[in-house]
Amino acid sequence: RSLVLYYPVTEARADGSVSWRTFATGCGMDAAFMDVCLVAYLNGHDPRDLLVSPAFATDEQLRRLPPVHILGADRDVLRDQGLRFARRLDALGCPVRAEALPGSTHLFVTVKGQPAAFARAVDFATEAMK
């Protein structure tokens, strides 16, 4: 039992991170579109709700998670959220593995055009299931 997260949203908000600012435009999932997605997804609900923003969970709640495997896109507004979440889990002693694929952009799992990143995503999930 484990969680495999591809380019996850761990904080349902514009986080102002380096990746959010650096890849705000020109890399597929830009910051403005992500903002629109978040508004639609939240539909007025609290963005700090743990079901949409696991980064706001308490340490005790996070310690109850199964092993977490995070694979992010290197050129993605969400990259830093996923990596920050992984660092927090690691600091809590939770089993976690995380990487950001060099040169990849958001949606490498579901949209054609990044075959090397897609292949790594399949291998990553396969490794997590062992």
Task: Show where each model-derived region lies.
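Alpha/beta-hydrolase superfamily serine-hydrolase fold, recognizing
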Residues: R1-K130
